[in-house]
Amino acid sequence: MGVTRIGLLGGSFDPVHVAHIALADTARQFLGLDQVQLIPAANPWQRQPLKASAPHRLRMLELAIAGHPALAINPVEIERGGATYTADTVRALPGGPQYFWLLGTDQLQNFCTWRDWQDIAARIELAVATRPGASIAPPAELAAWLAAHRRQLHELPFAPMAVSASDIRQRLAAGAATDGLLPEPVAAYIATHHLYR
């Protein structure tokens, strides 16, 4: 039996939406992952304060991944609390599996601003979601580091989806429709608990 391959998708998931689930499923299939763990942030240091509480975001994730047996929630950052740094999360991963951190092209461009980014890149593989047919151009500092350490970026063809959590929050606050943007159980949960109003 080979090494277990695990994808890691960090985010605020405020709220989790269809593009998050589609990216996780695509990564699992394209990279041959045994599991994709969604890692909700406690307090992401480069983002605005979160709107929904950790228990609400965890419950929405549970609802979103129901029916996706290869997707799981890793609550390590919420359990740790405080400022959320990917480097701390990566250092806490148990040994054995091969890990792939899933990034968007926007995250790739600011990756070298992350705390201890070299340590992250040394410990896990980086997989970047790109438009099908497009190539990725990492920042020069990251490209040089990868070349010096004989590492590569894994490209993950993923058609962009016009979905963002901030747009969904604005729509919900305005009472506008979010049809097709949220998994149905998540939309029902948000309505029941009057979130993002």
Swiss-Prot record:
Do the record's keywords include Protease?
no
Which Pfam families does the record associate with it? CTP_transf_like
Q: In which pathway does it act?
A: Cofactor biosynthesis; NAD(+) biosynthesis; deamido-NAD(+) from nicotinate D-ribonucleotide: step 1/1
TM annotation in the entry: none
Any one GO biological process:
NAD biosynthetic process
Where does the UniProt annotation place the signal sequence?
none
Among CDD domains, the record links this protein to: NMNAT (cd02165)
The UniProt record lists the EC number as: 2.7.7.18
Q: Give the matching InterPro entries.
A: Cyt_trans-like, NadD/NMNAT, Rossmann-like_a/b/a_fold
- Which molecular-function annotations from GO does this UniProt entry contain? ATP binding; nicotinate-nucleotide adenylyltransferase activity
Keywords tagged on the record: ATP-binding, NAD, Nucleotide-binding, Nucleotidyltransferase, Pyridine nucleotide biosynthesis, Transferase
The chemistry this enzyme catalyses reads: nicotinate beta-D-ribonucleotide + ATP + H(+) = deamido-NAD(+) + diphosphate
Keyword hit for Nucleotidyltransferase:
yes
- Superkingdom is Bacteria
What is the main EC category here? transferase
This chain's function reads: Catalyzes the reversible adenylation of nicotinate mononucleotide (NaMN) to nicotinic acid adenine dinucleotide (NaAD).
Family, according to the entry, reads as follows:
Belongs to the NadD family.
**Protein name per Swiss-Prot or TrEMBL:** Probable nicotinate-nucleotide adenylyltransferase
- Source organism: Bordetella pertussis (strain Tohama I / ATCC BAA-589 / NCTC 13251)
